[in-house]
């Protein structure tokens, strides 16, 4: 199995509910190590750039507004098949469709206020990690 890295963002709704520690426990209990982390208030420019892939979608403006509405917790996760494992832990984008016990089933409110973001591929993970972290900020352990 491949050791991978992926990005995870705990969105403003989950930060506001004070569930960062509960989410971190799920990562660690499932073999994902946190090798970099920072709390950040995203600027409008950062949110627009990070989610630029969605700029032509009808939900883009609302997503950018939501992601700049409060602080986020951004972390790099490392482990075997980290991208897929994190996506399984997150659950479906729509929390009403997310499996019981997933992060979104337990902490998300709606399809647009859905607690967490995670990379969808190893390639996108590398780009997303580089967007928020320099190599010197990542501490393999």
UniProtKB/Swiss-Prot annotation:
Gene behind this protein: ndk
Catalytic activity: a 2'-deoxyribonucleoside 5'-diphosphate + ATP = a 2'-deoxyribonucleoside 5'-triphosphate + ADP; a ribonucleoside 5'-diphosphate + ATP = a ribonucleoside 5'-triphosphate + ADP
Organism: Neisseria meningitidis serogroup B (strain ATCC BAA-335 / MC58)
Cellular compartment(s): Cytoplasm
Keywords, ordered alphabetically: ATP-binding, Cytoplasm, Kinase, Magnesium, Metal-binding, Nucleotide metabolism, Nucleotide-binding, Phosphoprotein, Transferase
One Gene Ontology biological process: pyrimidine nucleotide metabolic process
Source superkingdom: Bacteria
Protein role: Major role in the synthesis of nucleoside triphosphates other than ATP. The ATP gamma phosphate is transferred to the NDP beta phosphate via a ping-pong mechanism, using a phosphorylated active-site intermediate.
Enzyme Commission numbers on file: 2.7.4.6
Name of the protein in question: Nucleoside diphosphate kinase
Keyword Nucleotide-binding found: yes
Active site per UniProt: 117 (pros-phosphohistidine intermediate)
């Amino acid at each position: 199995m491949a050791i991978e890295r992926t990005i995870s963002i705990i969105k403003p709704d989950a930060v506001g509910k004070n569930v960062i520690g509960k989410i971190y426990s799920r990562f660690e209990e499932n073999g994902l190590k946190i090798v970099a982390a920072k709390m950040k208030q995203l600027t409008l420019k950062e949110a627009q750039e990070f989610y630029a892939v969605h700029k032509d979608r009808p939900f883009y403006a609302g997503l950018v507004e939501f992601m700049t509405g409060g602080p986020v917790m951004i972390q790099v996760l490392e482990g075997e098949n980290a991208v897929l494992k994190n996506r399984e832990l997150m659950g479906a984008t729509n929390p009403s469709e997310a499996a019981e016990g997933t992060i979104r089933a337990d902490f998300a409110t709606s399809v647009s206020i859905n607690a967490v973001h995670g990379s969808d591929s190893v390639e996108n993970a590398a780009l997303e990690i580089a967007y928020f972290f320099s190599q010197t900020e990542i501490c393999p352990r």
